[in-house]
C-alpha cells in the first residue's frame, strides 16, 4: 500500500469512515495553502499511483482549484477501471458537496 495513503487512511476522518476517499490533485504549493480535512494529496499526473492500493469500486472524490485537473484525473481513473471516481470540481465545490472543512 502506498505509504502516504496508508497513513491518511489510518487517521480515519468521517468521510473515510464511510468508505469515501478524497483526493486533492493540485500542486504541493496549492495543497499547503489549504485543503479539505479528509483529503490526501496526489498531483493529477500521478493519480494512477493509487491503482495497487485502492479497490476499483471505492468511491473516490477528486478536486483541484477549478475542476479542470480533477476532471483529467477522474478520466484517467475511470479509464483504468475505477467505476466510482467522481470529479468534485473546485476545492470550494468539493467542500460544499462533501460538507467538509478547509484546513492549512
What would you call each of these model-derived segments?
Residues 63-64:
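Metallo-beta-lactamase
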Residues 13-19:
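Sec/Tat signal peptide C-region and signal peptidase I cleavage site
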Residues 2, 19-21, 28-59, 68-104:
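Rhodanese-like catalytic fold shared by cysteine-dependent sulfurtransferases
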Residues 3-13:
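Sec-dependent N-terminal signal peptides
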Amino acid at each position: 500500500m502506498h505509504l502516504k495513503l496508508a497513513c491518511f487512511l489510518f487517521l480515519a476522518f468521517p468521510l473515510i469512515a464511510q468508505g469515501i476517499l478524497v483526493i486533492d490533485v493540485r500542486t504541493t504549493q496549492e495543497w499547503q495553502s489549504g485543503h479539505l480535512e479528509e483529503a490526501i494529496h496526489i498531483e493529477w499526473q500521478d493519480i494512477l499511483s493509487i491503482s495497487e492500493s485502492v479497490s476499483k469500486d471505492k468511491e473516490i472524490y477528486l478536486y483541484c482549484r477549478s475542476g479542470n485537473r480533477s476532471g483529467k484525473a477522474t478520466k484517467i481513473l475511470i479509464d483504468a477501471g475505477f467505476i466510482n471516481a467522481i470529479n468534485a470540481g473546485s476545492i470550494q465545490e468539493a467542500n460544499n458537496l462533501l460538507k467538509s472543512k478547509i484546513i492549512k
